């Protein structure tokens, strides 16, 4: 009888541990990670976009200060790039390759990490066209022609001392 009670209490204890193990991960899994929230924002951007092709996350800027409240809005900054997948594609976004000359857009805004409160405020603007453009060759810029630099001639501070002019006395040599 005692062994039945021990096995029954052991069964109850393991059942409680199992239930506790199932409940705790689901409570902690409710909050999205920063990256997951940004990926959801990219999905929402693709849904609202009128572009011909879908966009995929290219680069995610560093995460902001870790606020423990998943309901607060967190600032985000990331870049998306145009993919080969058309908007009507049912293919998962992760399987879409980036378009070779695809547009890159810089996106900034706010997201919440609470999946039940899907609030995204994202604005994306074209950053650049990712095309290789050879540099334009221009002749070197030369300054206009100036004569060589010469310092200005300054008059002496005091005029040189000359003896006064005296006409010669008497006949001039060579004159008769």
Swiss-Prot record:
Pyrrolidone carboxylic acid PTM positions: 30
Disulfide bonds: 85-96, 107-124
Keyword annotations: Amidation, Antibiotic, Antimicrobial, Disulfide bond, Pyrrolidone carboxylic acid, Repeat, Secreted, Signal
Assigned GO CC terms: extracellular space
Modified residues (Proline amide): 173
BP-aspect Gene Ontology terms: antimicrobial humoral immune response mediated by antimicrobial peptide; defense response to Gram-negative bacterium; defense response to Gram-positive bacterium; innate immune response
Tissue specificity of this protein: Large granules of neutrophils.
PTM comment, free text: Elastase is responsible for its maturation.
One GO MF term: lipopolysaccharide binding
Propeptide: 30-130, 174-176
Residues making up the signal peptide according to the UniProt record: 1-29
Family label: Belongs to the cathelicidin family.
Domain comment quoted from the record: BAC5 sequence consists almost exclusively of X-P-P-Y repeats.
Function: Exerts, in vitro, a potent antimicrobial activity. Probably due to an impairment of the function of the respiratory chain and of energy-dependent activities in the inner membrane of susceptible microorganisms.
Name of the protein in its database record: Cathelicidin-2
Organism (species): Bos taurus
